[in-house]
Amino acid sequence: MTYNDRMTLFARIGFAARGLVYILIGWFALDVAIHGGRPMDNQGVLGTLVDAPLGHVLLGICALGFAGYAIWRLTEAITDPERLSNDMKGRFKRAGHAVSGIVHVTLAMAAGRLALRQTSAQGSSPGDRSAESWSAWLLAQPGGVAILVAVGAGFFAVAVAQGIKAYKARFDELDGRIPAPDYVRWIGRLGYAARALIFAIIGWFLISAALNHDPDRAGGLGEALMELRAQPEGVLVLSVVACGLALFGMFSLIEARYRRISVAKPGFLG
């Protein structure tokens, strides 16, 4: 199997793992909307697989998939196999690939530790605690406020990009008939819209933490879902967003099968 074949396979496993995680996030968030409780972020959802039948096998596959996905995204950022333009839009997209790669490195590590029983499955939203802890560390550094504001603004920018993707709903990165069938476009459209809203809320949390110099205001996916639950008509709002996140998971499974994967070996690998 060539390097390109391996990277394509790992990327597809990564899309499938992401799909599984988002479907579970949506399912648990819908349960919270109806019955109360605290929603889970992606690391919390991985913890629920520990006690599932063949859970450690699933976690091992997720770890492999997330690691492969991370390498693919980081390679995209370095080698630019899509031949993106060198303008601001192209640079922003490559930066997004790099950030996505880093995020999936942390998910691969979390899934790997759980698969090897090296960490506890307890705790519903470790991502929220880590957001608070690294925000506290950042605010203690010179220029930390400005950096945290920039990170929050980055989340807003990603939210806008995902919102635009939901609105246009072209999804021309999928193989097969173009444009994609209407039902696929609607799955992707609703999924990306829900994800855009979550990213915008996380961005606001980070900017608020920076401007108020209060790391407790920072939060991740779990806190964003709790914020929706606390709003007027929160049950309805969270239910809709939960369904949207589950649809994003379904769209990721579609991508695992049909997405065109652009791969280029970094020069330093020979």
Label every model-predicted segment.
Residues 235-255, 259-270:
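A cross-kingdom marker for long, charged
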Residues 34-44, 119-132, 171-175, 213-223:
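Peri-membrane helix termini and adjoining interfacial loops of integral membrane proteins
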Residues 186-229:
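Glycine/small-residue-rich hydrophobic helix-like segments
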Residues 43-50, 134-137, 215-236:
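Short, membrane-exposed interhelical loops at transmembrane-helix boundaries
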Residues 5-6, 10, 24, 28, ...:
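Hydrophobic, ordered structural segments
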Residues 19-39:
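Alpha-helical transmembrane segments of multi-pass membrane proteins
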Residues 77-98, 165-189, 256-270:
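Cytoplasmic juxtamembrane regions at transmembrane-helix boundaries
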Residues 18-25, 98-112, 190-207:
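Hydrophobic alpha-helical membrane-insertion segments
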